C-alpha cells in the first residue's frame, strides 16, 4: 500500500482487505462470546497495536507513512472493540474509518501531485493558500479521525471507548489506553496538517504549485461530506 499510488493506498487502507480478520471475528461473534479469555487477548493485542501505531506515526516525516501507521493504530482500535464484545461498534468504526482514511490518502495524493512527487513533510508548508480545497477536505478528515464531536469518527470512537469501560469484557485500563491513543491520534494528525499546510513553504518550485484538477478534487469533497455525516 505504501509503494503504490495513493488511490491504491486509499482503497487498500479503507476497504476490507486490511479488515478481513476483524470481519471474521464479527461474523463468528457467537463463538467468541463463549471464550472470554480469547476476547481478553484480542482486546489486549488491539490496545497495544493502537498505541504502538500511534506512537510510530508521531515520528514519521513522510506524509503517506503517517497515514499508514495511523491505519495500523485504527485497526487496533477496531480489535479493541471486538475484544470487549462491542462487535457492532467495531464494524461501525470500519465504516467511518473507510470514509476519512480514503479522504486523507487521496488528499495526500493531491499534495504529492502538486509538489511533483514530494512526500517529505519537512519540505512542505504554507500550502493552504495554494491548495484550498485539498486543505479544507483534509482538515475535515483530520477532525473526523481525531474524534471531534459531530464528525463521523466521534460516534464510532465514543462507542468503542464506552464499551471498553462499561462492557463485562472491558476494564478501566483498556479505556485509559484507548483514550490515550485517541489523544495521540489527534496530535500526530494535526502535526501533519501543520507541517503540510501552515508555516512557510520549505520546498522548491513554489511558483508551479497549484490545486489539482476537479477530477481529483471532487472525490475529496464527496468523502469529506461522508466523513462529516457518516456517523449519523
Where on the chain are the PLM-derived regions?
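Hydrophobic transmembrane alpha-helices and their helix-loop junctions in integral membrane proteins
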Residues: 1-215, 226-232
